[in-house]
Amino acid sequence: MKLILIKPVKKLGKIMDIVDVANGFGRNYLLPRNYAIRATNANLEIVKSTVQQLNEKNQKGIAAAQAVMQKIDRSFITFICQTSDDGKLFGSITAKEIIKKLQISSDIKAYIDIKPIKTAGIHEVEVSLHAEVHCKIFINVARSNTEAQEYLKKFNTSLQDTNNNVLVEKNSSIS
């Protein structure tokens, strides 16, 4: 039985895929649960036009996400919070707070998959702006602005040290 998937089905296919399945699986599982429709000529025409519209919409979404990525990629966001003497936060910084501080336009949905940040310092976070567009930002958590500046200085020096090590490794492999 040939069917067109209208919802993603694990181990079978994604939306708008044309699949060939056993008659019983199609009649008893996919069709009643509205996971698929029959692959008739009329439905195939509709799917082709829908796929084209979705691809155009997807390209616009990617372009908008890349424009936002250019603005926020490798940027620093500072949070001034109360911490204990050993650098543990009283509370935590969640993905929701980070997204709110990023102030991304409402037409783009940012997604951050992290555990809540509970320690002071600089944390690297990956932000997904689209399924195909990702960028990294740095979260600077400190007790005060001066402490935040110290963390930035330490981070920049460690970054320069790693860059120097990479250059040494590249030069040694050339010799």
Curated annotation (Swiss-Prot):
InterPro entries in the record, alphabetically? Ribosomal_bL9, Ribosomal_bL9/RNase_H1_N, Ribosomal_bL9_bac/chp, Ribosomal_bL9_C, Ribosomal_bL9_C_sf, Ribosomal_bL9_N, Ribosomal_bL9_N_sf
- Give any single GO term for biological process: translation
GO molecular function annotations of the record: rRNA binding; structural constituent of ribosome
* Keywords, comma-separated and alphabetical: Ribonucleoprotein, Ribosomal protein, RNA-binding, rRNA-binding
Q: Does the keyword RNA-binding apply?
A: yes
What is one GO cellular-component annotation here?
ribosome
Q: Which Gene3D superfamilies match?
A: Ribosomal protein L9, C-terminal domain, Ribosomal protein L9, N-terminal domain
Keyword NADP in annotation: no
Q: What job does the chain carry out?
A: Binds to the 23S rRNA.
Q: Which HAMAP family match?
A: Ribosomal_bL9 (MF_00503)
Question: Member of which family?
Answer: Belongs to the bacterial ribosomal protein bL9 family.
Q: What is this protein called?
A: Large ribosomal subunit protein bL9
Annotated organism of origin: Orientia tsutsugamushi (strain Boryong)
